[in-house]
Amino acid sequence: MHEAGTPTYAYDLEAVAAEVREMRAAFEGGAHLVAYAVKANSAGPVIRAVGAEGCGADVVSGAEILVALGCGIPPERIVYSGVAKGDGEIDRALACGERGIGALQVESMEEIDRVEARACALGRRARVSVRVNPGVDVTDETHAHIATGHDAAKFGVSRDDVAVAARRVESSKQLELVGISAHAGSQLSSIGPYLEVARVVFGIVGDLRRAGCGRALAFVDTGGGFGIDYGAAPPRRNKAPEPDGRSSTPPRPADFIRAVRAEQIKSGLGDLALCVEPGRSLVAPHGVLLAGVIQAKVTRTTRWVMIDAGMNDLLRPALYQARHRVVPLDREVDPAHALTWRVVGPVCESSDDFGEHPLPPDPPGAVAILDAGAYGYTMASTYNGRPLPVEVFIRGGALVGRTQRVNVEAWASERIAAGGDAVPPKQH
C-alpha cells in the first residue's frame, strides 16, 4: 500500500480463479458457458484470470467487446446484452472473427429489425438470443435499481411476444436464433426467484419447440445475480441452501447452478447448453478498497472517521444504500474496547458515507473497505476533481501488476484544456 498510495483497489486473482472452478464444477459435466459479467470489473488481469478458467464474457457495450477480445476471450464465447445497442456497437459484434460473437441478446422487436439491417449491410449472419422479460419481481430480495426482470422494467421482450419475436428471427436470412435468455436482477439472496426465472425460460423454449420453432437453439441463459454476503464473513463454500431456497447468508453460486441445472433436465432441455452470467459473485469478495485516514472528528452526537476514499471511488453505498465492512489495516479490533465510528469520505455530499463501524478508540492510519471487487472501479468517477483510484493485482501473495495513479495536476490540465482555446464572447 505504501508504494501504491491510497485510494487503491487490490484484487486477489488466485481467489477469483478458484471461484470460477467451483462454479464450473457445479455443472457436473453438462454443456455450459459461464459468461463473466464484464461490467462488474473490467480490469484486464481479472478478465484474463477468468478466461484462463474457461469463462466467456457477458458484455453490455462495444467497448466491453474490445476489452473481452483484447483479454483473449474468443468471440463465440461472448454474449452482448443491453436495451440500446448503437449501430456501431452492433457492427463491432458482427465483425468479430469468422461468425461474429456468440449471441446478440435482442431485447425488442425494434432491435431485431436493426440487427437484421446491420447484418445485411455487412453481409453477415447474426447469431441472436431473445432476452425475455420474465415478469419476476425481486425487489424484496434486492435494491430496486438492480431488479431487472419485473413487468415495468425496460429490459427484455414481453413473455407474450416472445413467440412472435422468435418466429421473426427465424424468418430472416440474416439472423439465426441460438438462444433464449432472461435475467431477474442482481444480488439475489435466495434461489427461489432465480428458479422462477429459469422455469419461465424453460417453459418458453418448450412451447417454441412444440410449435416447431427454435430448432437451431444452442443454449438457454438464466442470467446471473448470485448474491454475496456484504455484512458478515463470506459464506462457507459448498454451503447447502435452506429447504425453501432461503439462507441466513446467500447460497453459494454453485447451489444456484445445481438447482437450475436440475430444473433444466426436468424440463427435458438437457440437450441445450446452460449459460449463466455471474459477475459480483466471482470478484466482489476478492477485492478491497484501501483508504488512508485523514482525520477523526468528534461532535456531540457522532464520532467521525474521515478517509481519502469517497463515493467517487466506491459509489455503491450512496447509490444503493449498500453496506461494506470497514476494518483497520494496522491492528485488530478488540470488541471489548471498540467504539462506533461513522466512516465518511471527502466528497461534498452527505451521501458520501460508508456507515457506522466498530473501530479502536484511537482511529487507525488506514482502513480496508471489504468486498469491493465488483462495481467499484467500474462505477468510479472524477467527481469533485478527485482522480480515479489505482488498481493492484495480487497472485499467490505477490504483486503481479498495477495501474498508475493520475496526479491532480494532470487531471487539472486536461480539464483546463477541454474545448481547446474556446473563450466566452466579449460583452458589449
Task: List where the protein language model places each region.
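A charged N-terminal "starter" segment
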Residues: 1-127, 172-176, 210-212, 363, ...
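Short acidic, glycine/serine/threonine-rich loops at helix termini
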Residues: 47, 70, 90-95, 115-118, ...
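Active-site loop/helix belt of alpha/beta enzymes
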Residues: 134-295, 384-386
